[in-house]
């Protein structure tokens, strides 16, 4: 076998990776079609909530990274497609999380939703409603370090425009991004005097969510800074 090195090796690995990735997409598309065909043939299509989602997004070389775990948009944003018979069509702008799936399924099944569950049912959004008290920010915490993926521990908060991330434990690095002006998160604004008010607001929101979700580790490192 030919021995590859340097740029040639990197390009070969990338092409092999992309071929596998595209084969997975083709397989997912084919198998979703099989499920939809079955539901239609058995008169179940208009009586079934269809959900396609994933645990996280995936990097395809962005930020020099393949895989997931970091809180940057390519990984943080998770695919979610839902088809509710008679439900709203098109995009839903509200911020949702995977912790919302369980209460959604429970409500649709007519089962009680435990009081201590952290998510919110998506059923109102699927029906086209806009709840006034819907969340305006999202919390994230990655803590599996040291581990084989070598992703530093970090937590953060994202609202409809800004994202604040804190890498902690054996390092202490803060990052702030304006997702409207810098959607690829290439320009860290943390520490810039002109963003002092944004930093304070996002730090306050971060602390609020850490208390809401009962994250003592995040609170300890956030407050101690």
Language-model features: where?
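Active-site-proximal cap/lid insertion segments
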Residues: 1-98, 108-116, 166-174, 183-186, ...
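C-terminal cap/loop subdomain of S1 sulfatases and analogous C-terminal strand-loop tails that border
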Residues: 56-62, 83, 88, 99-102, ...
